[in-house]
Amino acid sequence: MSASQQSRTSIFTPVLIGGSLILLINFALRASFGVFQIPIASEFGWPRAEFSMAIAIQNLAWGIGQPIFGALGERFGDRWSIIIGAFLYSAGLVLTAYATTPASMQLLEVMVGFGIAGTGFGVILAVIGRAASDENRSLALGIATAAGVQ
């Protein structure tokens, strides 16, 4: 076994576990928004359509952010994409707790959507794919993908 193969083998398991945990947390939080739709809408007296629009905007920002964070990862390294994405996601979630109008909620969901793009499948699976050997790549990508799909 060459030195590069040994290095790849030694980092494979932590990368797979770390990437899977990022995806698990990322998409578990994202999926929980639906649980809070009715309580938040009734608490603030918003129509449910306003909260639904915020989630739709989040999905749109996630889609727009995917190629941006992919390019960021290629140019500056995946670590920076993940760090920036995690910061945006965390800041967006914290600030969303203080949103008192539908417009502020919708605006903050743009930040959350970009955060999801930076910590989502595109960036994380690229890191795991590079860390895995040719023989283990399909299994590793399957495990990580399953972690992100609740």
Describe the function of each predicted region.
Residues 64-103:
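Conserved MFS/SLC helix-loop-helix module at the cytosolic interface between two early adjacent transmembrane helices
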Residues 27, 31, 59-67, 119:
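Residue-level signature of mid-helix packing/kink "hotspots" within the transmembrane helices
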Residues 58-65, 92, 147-150:
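MFS transmembrane alpha-helix packing/gate-lining sites
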Residues 19-27, 59, 93, 101-114:
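Helical-face signature of the major facilitator-like transporter fold
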Residues 1-22, 26-27:
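Cytosolic juxtamembrane N-terminal segment immediately preceding the first transmembrane helix
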Residues 34-64:
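Extracellular/periplasmic helix-loop-helix junction of adjacent transmembrane segments
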Residues 108-146:
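Cytoplasmic helix-loop-helix junction between adjacent transmembrane helices
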